[in-house]
C-alpha cells in the first residue's frame, strides 16, 4: 500500500515514553556487543561492567542530590513504587497498636500505579488501614488542610513531584512542612518520574524516604529505572535471590540500560553533548505550541495553569470534540499525542481532571501534548505547522470554521449519524435543494450541527425529536432559534404546515426534503408522545409505492432491545400495537435508525432484530397476545439498573453481541489480495478530516463511521460485493465490518491492526 502523502512522524507524547537518545542507544549496544560482562563476575569483563554500573550510580547520586542516601537500580518506576511501599508498610506494621485504625494517604491525582499498589500491599500484609485520597484544588495542588488533619494517623503518605497528565508540580518544601509539622515519622514516598530533567532535585535536603524514577521517560531504554532510599529509611527487598545490588535488589543487573542511563546523566550534569534545552527554551517551546493551538482552534481550553506546571506538558480540550476525535485527527497527521496516561488508554475521561473539579466535557475531551528536553526548534516548528493542517482538515469536513482549505470542502449528501455516549442524532441533507432535517438533536452537538449547516450552506427544514427524552434535554431549541425562527411547530419540532400522504390506505402528515418525504407515524409505547419518521421516495409514494430509505424509530426498537416501558408516560400495550403497525408498513428490510446505539451497531432492521430478540419475533409473528407481551416486557425492564450520574438506559439488552466471522488481513496479505483481485473494494472508514490529511492511493472510497448507515442504504442491493475496511488501528474497521455482516453483507473483511501495524511492517 502506497501513501498519497508522506508525513514524517512528530512525536509529542514524551510523558508516555521517549525515543532512546542515539548516544545512549550506542552505549547500550556497546554493552551488548563488547562490554557485555556480568557486573557480579570477578574477571576483567565483569570488572569493566561493574565500573559502568558504579559510574552510573555515582552520577545518579549527583543528579538527585542524594547525598548519603542510596540509589538502587530497578526495572522501572512501577518496581520502584512497589519497593518504597513494601518497605514503608513492612516497617509501619511493626509499630502499629492493636485496635487502632490507621490510614494511608495518597494524592488524588497520583498515577494509578500508586493507589493500586497501596491497596495490594495493604491487603497482602494484612494491615487493613483506610486508604484515603488527598483532594486537590482546581490547579491540582494538594489540600494542605486535609493532610494536616489526616497525616497524624497515617502510616504512609504518597505524593508526586510532577503530574504525568497535566505537568502540574507540587511545592515539595511547603508540602514537607505540612507533613512533618503534623507527623515527623510518617513514611513519605514521592513519585519523581516526571520531575527528572524538568525540576531541580536535592533529595538529601528533604525528608522524602522513597523516590522512584523511570529511564524510558527520559531517553533511556524501557526496562531500566532506579529508586532513591533516604539514609536511615527502612528497606525490605522487593526481589530476593542472588544478592545483587548489595542484597537490596536481586537479579542480574541490566547493563545496557545502565550504560544508557550513564549517557542521560551526563546530559543532566552538563557533561554531555548539550542536547537538552534549558528551562527557558522549553518554556518558549510550550508558548509556541500553545499559540499554534489557539490559532488553529480558537475555543481551545487549557486544563492546567502554566504557572505551576513544568513547561514540557500541555493538557487541553477543544469544545465540541471528544479526545478520541482529536487523537484520531492528530494521528492521521502523524502527530503523536495522547488522551491521558498511556497506562490507561481505554479510559474515556481523565480522573486527574475530575479530581481537579474541571467540567465533565473537559475531562472527556482532554488531550495531552508532551515533549522532552531533547526536542528541537525544528520539531516544534513542524508540530505547529501540522496543528494548522489538522484544523484545516476539520474545516474541510465542515466540523470547524477554518480559513483555507486542504481541498474543496466535502459536499454533504445523504445521512450522517452523530453520537454522544449511547445517544444518536441524525442529519439528512439533500444536495440538490441544499435542504436538511435533523432528527433527535443532542444539546452537546448543537455547535457542531450549526457549524455544518453554515459551512455547507444548508437550509434547515426541521429539527424534530422522536419523543420527549428522559436521559437528556433536546438540542432542538438552539437549532430552531438559529434557523427556524419563523416556523410554527409542535413541542417535538414537527412543523404545523405539512402535506398529507397516503400509505396502505392510511393518511399521514409529511414534509418535503428534496426528492424525499419525511412521514410522521405515531408509535406510542416507550412514551405516549413517541413518533417514528419514515424517509421515503416522493415520486414513488405519489405513485402508490412505498420506497423507504430510513425509519427514525426513536426508542421503539433498539439494537438488541426494545425501548423501555416503565416510565410514567410509557404504555407496553401501545408498544405492542406500534411494533406490529410499523413493521407492516415498512417491512423487515427497511433500515431502522434508533435514537440510541449502546453497542456500536449503527443501524438495524426488523429482520436482524427478530433473529436475536425472541420477544420482538413473537410480536411480529403474532405468537404472543398483548397481555403476554406486557407481562414479558415488565420482566425485561427489570434488567435496567439506573444509576445516579450515569447515562439512563432506554432499553434492556436482550440480543447478542456475538461477532460474525470476518476475514482479517495483515499488511502483506492485503497487498497480495489487491494484486490478484481487482474487484475488491478497499474502503477507508476514518472520518473525512483524517482521510483528507493522509490516505493511501488504492482506496476506492472513504466511508466514515458517521456515514456507514448511508453506505449500507446505498449498497442494500449489492451485499455480495467484496469489501475490505481499513482504519487507524483496526478497531473501527472491525466494528463496521461486524455491523455490515449482521445486516447480510456476506463478503466483508478488514485490515487487522489498521494503518498502525501496516506502516510498522
Which residues are covered by each model-predicted region?
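Pyridoxal 5′-phosphate
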Residues: 1-411, 421
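Catalytic core of the metallo-beta-lactamase
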Residues: 412-456, 500-600, 605, 723
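Catalytic cysteine-centered active loop of the rhodanese-like fold, especially the PTP/DSP P-loop
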Residues: 711-760
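Di-metal (Zn2+ and/or Mg2+/Mn2+) metal-binding site signature of metallo-dependent hydrolases
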Residues: 82, 217-218, 459-482, 526-534, ...
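Short amphipathic alpha-helix with an adjacent loop that forms part of the alpha/beta core around
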Residues: 143-153, 448-456, 510-514, 672-674, ...
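Active-site neighborhood of phospho(di)ester-bond hydrolases with catalytic His/Asp-centered motifs
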Residues: 75, 107, 191, 212-215, ...
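Active-site metal-binding motif and surrounding structural segment of the metallo-beta-lactamase
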Residues: 444-494, 502-503, 510, 724
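Accessory terminal helices/loops
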Residues: 397-416, 422, 577-681, 687-688, ...
Amino acid at each position: 500500500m502506497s501513501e498519497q502523502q508522506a508525513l514524517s512522524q512528530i512525536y509529542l507524547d514524551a510523558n508516555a515514553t521517549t525515543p532512546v537518545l542515539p548516544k545512549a542507544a550506542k552505549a547500550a549496544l556497546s554493552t551488548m556487543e563488547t562490554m557485555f560482562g556480568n557486573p557480579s563476575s570477578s574477571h576483567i569483563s565483569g570488572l569493566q561492567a561493574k565500573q559502568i554500573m558504579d559510574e552510573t550510580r555515582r552520577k545518579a547520586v549527583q543528579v538527585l542530590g542524594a547525598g548519603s542516601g542510596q540509589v538502587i537500580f530497578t526495572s522501572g518506576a512501577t518496581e520502584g513504587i512497589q519497593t518504597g511501599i513494601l518497605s514503608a508498610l513492612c516497617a509501619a506494621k511493626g509499630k502499629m497498636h492493636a485496635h487502632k485504625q490507621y490510614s494511608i494517604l495518597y494524592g488524588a491525582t497520583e498515577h494509578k500505579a500508586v493507589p493500586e499498589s497501596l491497596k495490594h500491599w495493604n491487603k497482602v500484609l494484612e494491615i487493613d488501614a483506610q486508604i484515603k485520597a488527598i483532594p486537590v484544588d482546581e490547579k491540582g495542588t494538594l489540600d494542605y488542610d486535609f493532610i494536616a488533619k489526616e497525616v497524624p494517623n497515617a502510616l504512609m503518605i504518597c505524593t508526586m513531584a510532577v503530574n504525568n497528565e497535566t505537568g502540574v508540580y507540587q511545592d515539595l518544601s511547603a508540602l514537607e512542612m505540612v507533613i512533618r509539622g503534623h507527623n515527623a515519622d510518617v513514611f513519605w514516598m514521592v513519585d519523581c518520574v516526571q520531575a527528572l530533567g524538568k525540576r531541580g532535585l536535592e533529595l538529601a535536603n528533604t525528608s522524602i524516604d522513597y523516590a522512584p524514577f523511570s529511564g524510558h521517560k527520559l531517553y533511556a531504554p524501557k526496562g531500566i529505572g532506579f529508586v532513591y532510599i533516604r539514609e536511615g529509611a527502612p528497606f525490605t527487598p522487593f526481589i530476593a535471590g542472588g544478592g545483587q545490588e548489595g542484597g537490596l535488589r536481586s537479579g542480574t543487573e541490566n547493563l545496557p540500560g545502565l550504560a544508557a542511563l550513564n549517557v542521560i546523566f551526563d546530559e543532566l550534569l552538563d557533561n554531555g553533548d548539550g542536547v537538552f534545552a534549558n528551562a527557558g527554551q522549553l518554556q518558549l517551546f510550550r508558548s509556541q505550541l500553545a499559540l499554534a493551538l489557539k490559532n488553529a482552534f480558537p475555543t481551545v481550553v487549557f486544563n492546567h495553569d502554566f504557572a505551576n506546571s513544568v513547561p514540557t506538558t500541555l493538557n487541553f480540550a477543544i469544545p465540541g470534540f471528544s479526545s478520541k476525535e482529536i487523537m484520531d485527527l492528530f494521528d492521521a497527521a502523524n502527530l503523536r499525542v495522547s488522551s491521558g496516561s498511556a497506562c490507561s488508554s481505554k479510559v474515556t475521561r481523565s480522573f486527574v481532571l475530575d479530581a481537579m473539579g474541571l467540567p465533565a466535557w473537559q475531562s472527556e475531551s482532554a488531550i495531552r501534548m508532551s515533549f522532552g528536553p531533547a526536542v528541537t526548534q525544528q520539531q516544534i516548528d513542524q508540530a505547529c505547522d501540522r496543528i494548522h493542517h489538522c484544523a484545516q482538515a476539520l474545516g474541510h469536513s465542515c466540523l470547524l470554521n477554518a480559513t483555507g482549505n486542504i481541498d474543496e470542502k466535502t459536499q454533504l449528501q445523504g445521512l450522517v449519524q452523530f453520537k454522544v455516549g449511547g445517544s444518536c442524532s441524525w442529519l439528512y441533507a439533500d444536495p440538490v435543494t441544499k435542504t436538511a432535517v435533523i432528527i433527535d438533536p443532542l444539546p452537546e452537538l448543537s455547535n457542531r450541527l450549526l457549524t455544518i449547516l453554515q459551512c455547507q450552506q444548508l437550509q434547515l427544514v426541521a429539527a424534530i425529536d422522536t419523543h420527549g427524552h428522559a436521559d437528556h434535554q433536546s438540542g432542538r431549541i438552539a437549532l430552531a432559534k438559529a434557523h427556524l425562527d419563523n416556523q410554527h411547530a409542535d413541542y417535538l419540532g414537527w412543523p404545523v404546515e405539512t402535506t398529507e400522504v397516503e400509505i396502505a390506505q392510511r393518511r399521514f402528515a409529511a414534509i418535503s426534503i428534496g426528492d424525499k418525504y419525511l412521514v410522521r407515524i405515531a408509535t406510542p409505547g416507550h412514551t405516549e408522545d413517541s413518533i417514528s419518521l419514515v424517509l421515503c421516495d416522493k415520486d414513488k409514494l405519489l405513485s402508490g409505492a412505498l420506497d423507504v430509505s430510513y425509519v427514525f424509530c426513536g426508542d421503539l426498537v433498539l439494537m438488541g432491545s426494545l425501548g423501555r416501558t416503565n416510565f410514567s408516560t410509557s404504555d407496553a400495550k401501545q408498544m405492542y400495537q406500534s411494533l406490529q403497525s410499523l413493521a407492516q408498513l415498512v417491512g423487515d428490510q427497511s433500515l431502522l435508525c434508533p435514537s440510541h446505539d449502546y453497542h456500536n451497531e449503527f443501524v438495524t432492521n426488523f429482520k436482524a432484530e427478530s433473529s436475536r430478540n425472541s420477544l420482538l419475533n413473537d410480536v411480529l409473528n403474532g405468537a404472543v397476545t398483548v397481555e403476554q407481551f406486557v407481562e414479558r416486557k415488565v420482566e425485561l425492564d427489570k434488567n435496567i439498573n439506573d444509576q445516579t450520574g450515569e447515562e439512563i438506559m432506554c432499553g434492556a439488552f436482550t440480543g447478542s453481541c456475538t461477532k460474525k466471522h470476518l476475514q482479517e488481513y495483515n499488511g502483506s496479505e492485503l497487498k497480495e489480495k489487491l494484486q490478484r483481485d481487482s474487484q475488491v473494494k478497499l474502503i477507508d472508514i476514518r472520518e473525512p478530516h483524517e482521510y483528507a490529511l493522509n490516505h493511501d492511493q488504492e482506496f476506492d472510497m472513504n466511508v466514515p463511521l458517521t456515514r456507514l448507515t448511508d453506505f449500507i442504504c446505498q449498497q442494500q442491493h449489492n451485499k455480495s460485493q467484496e469489501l475490505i475496511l481499513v482504519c487507524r488501528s483496526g478497531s473501527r474497521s472491525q466494528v463496521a465490518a461486524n455491523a455490515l455482516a449482521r445486516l447480510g453483507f456476506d463478503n466483508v473483511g478488514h485490515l487487522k491492526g489498521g494503518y498502525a501495524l501496516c506502516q510498522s511492517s
